[in-house]
């Protein structure tokens, strides 16, 4: 095993993983919101006049950016990231997958584009966002559990 990796404290490795995943989720979140605006459906204020679930989904950045800031300042913030990931997953799944009257079903992500390539790219962004949120939740949960076991 790499001696530098062995010497690095465990919390520092958790912090770096959470920071990387936080950046990943933020980038894919921005790409997904841009996709909503470009598609012109399931968008909302500030890009259209009406306030919609899209408008409220923009508040996720009020959770993501402080997490990134805390990580950059040297804090692990695992509980924060676990909360953010679970909120993000609940939001994304409820909007895209739950119920017959969901806000933005998958067919509206893919089928709106004239080109299958653009539709597929929009799906890749959505799947990347969901996988990033799952990875963030799992990593944050493991970091929380590791810190709990370390205290005993």
Question: What annotation goes with each model-predicted range?
Answer:
Residues 68-98:
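Loop-to-transmembrane helix junctions at the membrane interface
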Residues 56-67, 122-139:
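Hydrophobic cores of alpha-helical transmembrane segments in multi-pass inner/ER membrane proteins
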Residues 18-28, 56, 82-88, 122-129:
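Hydrophobic alpha-helical transmembrane segments of polytopic
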Residues 136-152:
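Cytosolic juxtamembrane helix at the C-terminal end of the final transmembrane segment
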Residues 1-25, 145-147:
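Cytosolic juxtamembrane helix and N-cap/initiation of the first transmembrane helix
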Residues 26-36, 87-104:
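C-terminal TM-helix exit segments that contain a strictly Trp-centered aromatic cap at the helix terminus
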Residues 40-49, 95-122:
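Interfacial non-cytosolic loop connecting adjacent transmembrane helices
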Residues 21-52:
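Hydrophobic transmembrane helix segments
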């Amino acid at each position: 095993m790499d001696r530098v990796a062995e010497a690095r404290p465990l919390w520092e490795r958790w912090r770096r993983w959470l920071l990387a995943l936080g950046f990943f989720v933020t980038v894919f979140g921005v790409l997904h919101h841009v996709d909503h605006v470009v598609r012109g459906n399931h968008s909302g204020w500030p890009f259209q006049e009406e306030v919609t679930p899209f408008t409220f989904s923009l508040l996720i950045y009020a959770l993501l950016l402080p997490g990134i800031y805390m990580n950059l300042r040297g804090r692990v913030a695992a509980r924060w990231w676990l909360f953010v990931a679970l909120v993000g997953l609940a939001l994304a799944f409820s909007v895209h997958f739950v119920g017959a009257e969901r806000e933005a079903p998958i067919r509206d992500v893919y089928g709106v584009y004239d080109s299958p390539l653009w539709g597929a790219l929009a799906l890749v962004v959505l799947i990347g966002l969901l996988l990033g949120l799952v990875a963030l939740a799992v990593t944050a949960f493991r970091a929380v559990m590791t810190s709990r076991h370390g205290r005993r």
